[in-house]
A protein has these predicted regions:
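Ser/Thr-rich, Pro/Gly/Ala-heavy low-complexity intrinsically disordered linkers and tails
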Residues: 1-51
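Short, surface-exposed polybasic-aromatic patches that bind anionic ligands, especially phosphate groups
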Residues: 48-331
Length: 331
């Protein structure tokens, strides 16, 4: 799907929406079994301890063994890693954090008794039907994608839509998807979601509560690449790629920051994000025209732009492609 740079998160009624730090829900404290290293490298879990997966508002954000939460720091590099990186312009591009205090992906946590409203979808055959628990002041991403993400507390499901607009007593969107955070079940093969990859939005966001409050991100991130193939690899289930080029990245391709990339000059949230990229990597979940590596994150007024600007000094050439699984033709 498409991306447009934006400066404000808009409500469904068209005005700016403010979110306090508490709106993201309660988050469990960091896993005591994981000790941040002194040298800026990837933190190591205690021997024999399986680190638990991420949580948000009392909900697991997929099981610990889900693809999003799997440590891939020791997995093999794909034999065509250099070819994929060359197609993605890695030799001349740098990371671009697509989030901050005034832009990024907003989301809201609602109670289980949140009123459900009717939904209509352009791609109804690949969308879970309504009603959805969308509040009237639903925060909507302020770019041309107009993504919306709602987490229902206790139910532990996320409801996500693409190209979202208020319509009558409910909302209209191009597509809608519901993900069960406890099971981590993927979309049916060939189905889209609020992203072109059929993947969820919320689990792939860099969030302030993790990067700063907890000091650790225990999952992969999502990024948008310029130009993708008509193909996808698990955990993706769909593609809307623009090319049949041999080494165009399929949706679901995972890159990770190389272990030998020196992190000693980084600090704060940026250091935490880079450690996560070494351990869990990031998935291609969407595409856009041009060439860039746009890392997804939650809009949060507490982000320090000075801190996040450190990410812009990380060259895309410092990444490598984790070995791909079976490649499926796109939808």
């Amino acid at each position: 799907m498409r991306i447009g740079w934006a400066l404000l998160a808009l409500s469904a009624c068209g005005g700016p929406i403010a979110r306090s730090p508490g709106d993201a829900g309660s988050v469990a404290s960091p896993d005591a079994s994981v000790v941040p290293p002194e040298d800026g490298g990837v933190p190591q879990a205690d021997a024999g301890v399986v680190s638990r997966g991420p949580t948000l508002a009392g909900c697991p954000v997929f099981p610990p063994d889900n693809a999003w939460n799997r440590d891939v720091s020791s997995e093999p590099v794909d034999s065509h890693s250099a070819d994929y990186l060359a197609f993605m312009g890695a030799s001349s591009l740098y990371l671009q954090p697509d989030f901050g205090g005034q832009y990024g992906q907003p989301f809201v946590v609602v109670p289980a008794d949140q009123a459900r409203v009717p939904m209509s979808f352009l791609y109804a055959s690949q969308s879970e039907p309504g009603p959805y628990p969308f509040p009237r002041d639903l925060p909507i991403q302020a770019n041309e994608d107009r993504h919306a993400t709602v987490l229902v507390r206790d139910e532990c499901r996320i409801y996500e839509t693409y190209n979202t607009y208020a319509s009558g007593s409910g909302f209209h969107a191009d597509s809608g998807a519901i993900f069960d955070l406890a099971s981590g079940a993927p979309r049916p093969d060939g189905w889209t979601s609020a992203t072109a990859a059929g993947l969820p939005i919320l689990p792939g966001l860099a969030r302030y509560d993790e990067a700063v409050d907890q000091g650790e991100i225990r999952h992969a991130l999502a990024f948008i690449a310029g130009g993708t193939a008509h193909a996808y690899v698990a955990p993706a289930t769909h593609s809307s790629g623009s090319t049949n080029a041999t080494y165009a990245p399929p949706m679901g391709l995972r890159v990770r920051l190389r272990a030998d990339f020196d992190l000693s000059r980084f600090n704060g949230a940026s250091l935490v994000i880079l450690r996560a990229l070494q351990r869990y990597g990031m998935f291609v979940t969407d595409s856009a025209g041009g060439q860039f590596w746009s890392v997804a994150g939650a809009q949060d007024s507490r982000w320090s732009i000075t801190d996040l600007d450190q990410l812009k000094t990380v060259p895309a050439s410092a990444f490598e492609v984790v070995r791909l699984g079976a490649v499926h033709s796109g939808q």
